[in-house]
């Protein structure tokens, strides 16, 4: 059951914002799933009965199941950042769901007068794709350096540490010293409120106005997770990492960014692997077999220029009903390395994207 007949992928969407990559390269149809024998229903799910694992569709019809797997994605927590509403997002785009918001942010950059500032705000964790804001900052800085050389991006961050921080800062110092300024919480980077009518953001001690403001707001699990009763008070979904079954509702499984699966990050790689582990577990449960413990992994590629990328990887096991990082496994790209390594990782990112989308959509 999918609300849209075409899917717009978030991975690589930052390149749409900052390079000449077309938005169409992010779009995928569902015909491949149908050809593989999957019964695809294009409809919006608006309700879930957790007692029967049945789903109510927007037209009022219901779909029953023995076990239900939810992939809720994320929704923005409107007004968690004062002043940031759905209406405000049409002026200060978040672009944290790929599609029209991606195009809106790109178009605002294109229309920017050279010399005018750009602002990005980054929320506290957790949120979808931990290194995503910093890849986006890199791509926006690249766009400004190439097309609006008198403009600069100011990143206002609610944190003082972030994923692949040393690697990003090394790249920024090399490529964008005049086009990117990052301010952490200790430097008054945490944004307290925004005003879309004034194109303004406010920290504890500063007011900054800019014609282009990219607000990445606090997030939560998508609305269908609330309807199913699988969210906790912070708005995310606790799960059993052996099966990804909700710990709040029996026979309902949750995968992807909506889950509480730390230290496994909210990433596309994680979601894809969680889906496979969950499907395997559900198949065994439906056959009255015990689920088999598995090892999970994650890799996140991030572009720092259109042809250079960095990565972080992790491996995770189930220990006492919670995921734990495997000591000595995974790692990050090396600092101060040859450009050919960064080029190779950029090529690997393309291969990963092509593989994961082929797996998902055929």
Report residues per predicted region.
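Beta1-alpha1 glycine-rich phosphate/pyrophosphate-binding loop at the start
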Residues: 1-39, 124-165
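Short glycine-rich anion-binding loops that position phosphate/pyrophosphate groups of nucleotides
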Residues: 6, 73-76, 219-221
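FAD-binding core/adjacent interface of flavoenzyme oxidoreductases
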Residues: 40-135, 142-146, 214
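A Rossmann-like FAD-binding core segment of flavoenzymes
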Residues: 36-56, 63, 141-235, 290-291
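FAD-site-proximal beta/loop scaffold in flavoenzymes
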Residues: 85-114, 208-273, 284
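C-terminal auxiliary extensions adjacent to catalytic cores
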Residues: 311-362
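FAD-binding beta-loop-beta segment adjacent to the flavin cofactor pocket
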Residues: 235-253, 305-324
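A conserved FAD-binding loop/helix module that cradles the flavin
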Residues: 256-304, 313
């Amino acid at each position: 059951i999918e609300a849209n007949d075409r899917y717009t992928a978030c991975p690589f969407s930052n390149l749409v914002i900052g390079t000449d990559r077309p938005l169409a390269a992010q779009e995928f149809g569902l015909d491949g799933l149908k050809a593989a024998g999957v019964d695809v229903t294009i409809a919006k799910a608006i309700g879930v009965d957790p007692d029967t694992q049945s789903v109510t569709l927007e037209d009022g019809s219901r779909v029953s199941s023995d076990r239900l797997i939810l992939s809720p994605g994320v929704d923005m927590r409107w007004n968690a950042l004062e002043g940031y509403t759905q209406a405000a997002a049409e002026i200060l785009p978040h672009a944290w769901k790929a599609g029209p918001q991606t195009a809106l942010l790109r178009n605002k950059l294109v229309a920017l007068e050279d010399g005018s500032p750009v602002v990005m705000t980054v929320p506290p964790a957790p949120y979808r794709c931990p290194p995503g804001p910093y890849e986006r900052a890199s791509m926006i800085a690249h766009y400004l350096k190439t097309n609006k050389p008198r403009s600069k991006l100011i990143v206002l961050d609610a944190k003082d540490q972030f994923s692949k921080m040393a690697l990003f800062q090394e790249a920024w110092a090399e490529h964008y010293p005049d086009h990117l300024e990052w301010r952490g919480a200790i430097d008054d980077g945490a944004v307290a409120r925004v005003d879309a009518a004034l194109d303004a953001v406010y920290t504890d001690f500063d007011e900054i106005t800019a014609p282009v403001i990219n607000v990445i707001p606090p997030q939560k699990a998508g609305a269908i997770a609330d309807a199913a009763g699988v969210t906790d008070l912070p708005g995310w979904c606790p799960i059993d990492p052996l099966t990804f079954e909700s710990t709040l509702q029996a026979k309902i499984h949750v995968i992807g960014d909506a889950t509480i699966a730390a230290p496994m990050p909210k990433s596309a790689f994680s979601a894809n692997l969680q889906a496979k582990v969950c499907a395997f577990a559900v198949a065994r449960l439906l056959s009255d077999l015990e689920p088999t413990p598995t090892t999970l992994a994650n890799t996140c590629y991030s572009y720092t220029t259109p042809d250079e990328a960095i990565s972080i990887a992790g491996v995770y096991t189930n220990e006492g009903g919670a995921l734990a990082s495997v000591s000595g496994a995974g790692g990050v790209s090396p600092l101060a390395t040859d450009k050919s390594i960064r080029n190779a990782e950029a090529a690997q990112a393309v291969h990963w994207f092509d593989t994961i989308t082929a797996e998902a959509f055929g």
